[in-house]
Every structure is written in C-alpha cells, then in structure tokens.
Design a protein with these regions (language model features):
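Residues lining hydrophobic/aromatic ligand-binding pockets adjacent to catalytic sites
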Residues: 1-207
C-alpha cells in the first residue's frame, strides 16, 4: 500500500484513494491481486490515539480487498484487544521475522483471519537501526533458521485457507535463495532459479 496512508504522518485523502484503486483495479478484476499489505513503521504505537484512528481508517477505506496489516511496535501485541479488533474486521495480522528489541512486536501473533501472511526481514541486528535500506536487510537465513521458519509456516497453513510468505532480505539476491530453500523444506513445487547465460560476444572466463 502507498506510504502516505501508513507512513510516519499518514494522511488518507479521497484523491489518493481513488488513484490507488484505479491503479490496482485491473489486478483485482482478473483475480491477480492476492492481498494488500499495510505496513506501519515501528513508531506506530497502539497507545497513540491517532494511530488507532489511522488503522481504523485504513481498514474502513480498503476493506473491500483482502488486507494484511504489519504492526511492528510491541504495544500492539501487548494490548488485549488488538487480535479481537482484527478478527472482527477479518484482517490478517502479519507474522514478522526480524531482529528483536525491547520495542519489537511479539515474534508470534495470533491468526486473525482465514489468511496467514508472513514477512521475513532477516535478523541483521547490528545494522537494523543504523543501516540503510540495503544493508539493513543484508542477512542470509541459515538452514537451521529456514527449518524454524518452515515450521511456523506449516503450523499456520493447517489453520488458514490462504497463506503468503515473503522474504524481504533482498541484499544481493538473498531473498530468492532463501525462498527456494524454504520451498524445498516444505516440499513445495517451484521453478529453478534461472542461470545467467553469457551473450554471444561475451568473454567467458576459463575454469
């Protein structure tokens, strides 16, 4: 979802909503729109009355689509009524894997709709707050960590009717590498990663 609706100073204008709906309408019409992701920043806290108004407005405005919300501050998982509110509105609470700090949302959140939605950001704790949009996600999950994530996905798949899982550790192609690994672990069919072929006039180094 576009940043103006979920960013640090979120403002939802009818003009922006109309333009956004117009842009994704072909995807929705032809059944190619899996779900909308509303990603809120770590500073988006439940005890902030403005934040709760924005969350409600996003759900009300885009409720005609399958909607998943990424709430990253622990106040949301510490609160008693977050899960109930999302369940009442049939909104998926995104399961996040990322470095954990005192302010982080809980590692495990309940399933709040018939759709499970996972985002794996990597665990680069050292660069999480001081890195840029590239180095923050410089993290390749180990085979042991892939098994851990696969188990979480498997448990959710037994309860949900629809499931999405995305790797966001996009440094130098780490995400597709880990995606293939978890699909192999879960014994899911997938296409092999394409191997870059040299151009006809490109020098190929001798092995």
């Amino acid at each position: 979802m576009y940043k103006e609706a979920t960013g640090e100073e979120a403002i939802i204008s009818q003009r922006d909503v109309d333009q956004f709906n117009y842009g994704i309408e072909p995807l929705a019409r032809y059944g190619k729109l899996g779900a909308l992701l509303a990603q809120f920043p770590p500073s988006f806290k439940k005890n902030d009355g403005y934040a709760q108004q924005i969350l409600s407005a996003v759900i009300r405005t885009f409720g005609q689509y399958r909607l998943a919300v990424e709430l990253r501050h622990r106040s949301w998982s510490d609160g008693e009524n977050t899960a109930r509110f999302l369940k009442d509105n049939n909104i998926s609470w995104v399961h996040i894997d990322e470095p954990k700090f005192q302010s982080s949302v809980a590692a495990e959140v309940p399933l709040t709709s018939n759709m499970a939605y996972f985002r794996f950001h990597g665990r680069n704790k050292e660069m999480w707050w001081k890195g840029d949009s590239e180095t923050r996600y410089k993290y390749l999950y180990s085979p042991e960590e892939i098994n851990e994530l696969a188990n979480r996905v498997k448990v959710a798949s037994d309860k949900a009717q629809l499931l999405f899982a995305f790797f966001n550790n996009h440094w130098q192609g780490y995400a597709p590498r880990n995606a293939v690994s978890i699909m192999r672990t879960l014994q899911l069919p997938f296409r092999e990663l394409p191997i870059q072929q040299p151009l006809p006039d490109e020098d190929v180094p001798e092995s």
